[in-house]
Each structure stands twice: as structure tokens, then as C-alpha cells.
Regions:
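Surface-exposed, charge/polar-rich loops and edge strands
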Residues: 2-42, 46-180
Length: 180
């Protein structure tokens, strides 16, 4: 049995793409996933399965297409994936920065292209780490936040709708939920 985090993009944001978590948990349980749990309303779902990841991705894509067609991108990571990522995080990730976010790669995303685009940005008072699961992005000061490449350019990037973003607090909570 493998424990997974399913990070869904763009649900329950600003009253759009409404998903009732209790219903989603039941539907995913009916799909054959076990120990299905959610954390907050923004698309953090956890479950256990013996099904290989590749097959799970196919199953979830088909499920979302029928039941939640507005869910077109998601990230699926195992507890093992998460723990390996944490082992390789840079020292700055544990420091007290103004803001820290993880831009999770979604299934099927051209990661090399995303990295190339982000590497071309001129950073302002911010720091990056390219991980296996996503891009870890730290902003040093709240005062300079609006000058950062993160604030000025990220929304305009062609891949923006194909990543799902979580802050550092949620990233830590994902780790806790994966251990359950």
C-alpha cells in the first residue's frame, strides 16, 4: 500500500469550480481508493492504494473528466516522493522568509520547458530551488514582494494553468497527512 497526495488545481477559489469535499471523498472511495482524507477546501486529497501510479493517473483523469470536467490538472505524489524531496531541500527553505511557496508540477507537464522559462527570469530579492516535484520559491521580504519575478511574471507564464501552488505551511501539512 502506498500513501498518496493528490493536489488538484483551481477548485473552490473565489466561488468558482465548487467541489464539496465530503462528496469527493466518497466518490474517490467508491473509485477504489482507501483512507481518503482532505485538508482544507482547496484540493489537498490524501489516500492509500495498491494501484501503480501510472494507472492511478489514468483513473483519476477519467474520473475528473466525467465528474469534475473543470479539474484538468493535478499533481500526484507518494509519501516516498515527498520524503525524498524534503531530503534535498536547500537550507534557505527552513529559514524564516516573508513568503515560501511550492509550484507543484502537474501530471503531463513539460517540466524542462517550465524550468527553462523560470530560469530566464530576473530575480529580485527571492530565491529558487528546482525540485523533482516542483519549484520551491522563497521571497525574502514583504516590502519587496511586489517587485519579485514571482509577483510580476508568474501569472503571465504559459505554464501557469498547469502548476498547482501551495504555501510552505500547506507543504508541511502534506507531509503530515502522508504519514497518517
Amino acid at each position: 500500500m502506498t500513501r498518496y497526495a493528490l493536489l488538484v488545481r483551481g477548485i473552490n477559489v473565489g466561488g468558482k469550480n465548487k467541489v464539496v469535499m465530503a462528496e469527493l471523498r466518497q466518490e474517490l472511495t467508491d473509485l477504489g481508493l482507501e483512507k481518503v482524507e482532505t485538508y482544507i477546501n482547496s484540493g489537498n486529497i490524501f489516500f492509500t492504494s495498491i494501484v501503480p501510479k501510472v494507472r492511478l493517473v489514468e483513473k483519476l483523469e477519467a474520473f475528473f473528466e466525467v465528474h469534475y470536467p473543470f479539474i484538468q490538472n493535478f499533481s500526484l505524489l507518494s509519501q516516498e516522493d515527498y520524503e525524498a524531496e524534503v531530503e534535498n531541500l536547500p537550507a534557505w527553505w527552513t529559514k524564516d522568509l516573508a513568503r515560501k511557496d511550492v509550484l507543484f508540477y502537474t501530471e503531463g507537464l513539460d517540466v524542462a520547458q517550465v524550468i527553462e522559462k523560470v530560469e530566464s527570469l530576473e530575480l529580485e530579492d527571492e530565491v529558487l530551488h528546482f525540485g523533482k516535484l516542483g519549484i520551491f520559491w522563497g521571497k525574502f521580504s514583504e516590502e519587496s514582494y511586489y517587485a519579485t519575478a514571482y509577483h510580476k511574471y508568474l501569472l503571465k507564464m504559459p505554464f501557469y494553468r498547469q502548476i498547482t501552488i501551495r504555501n510552505a505551511k500547506t507543504f508541511d501539512k502534506i507531509g503530515q497527512m502522508l504519514k497518517k
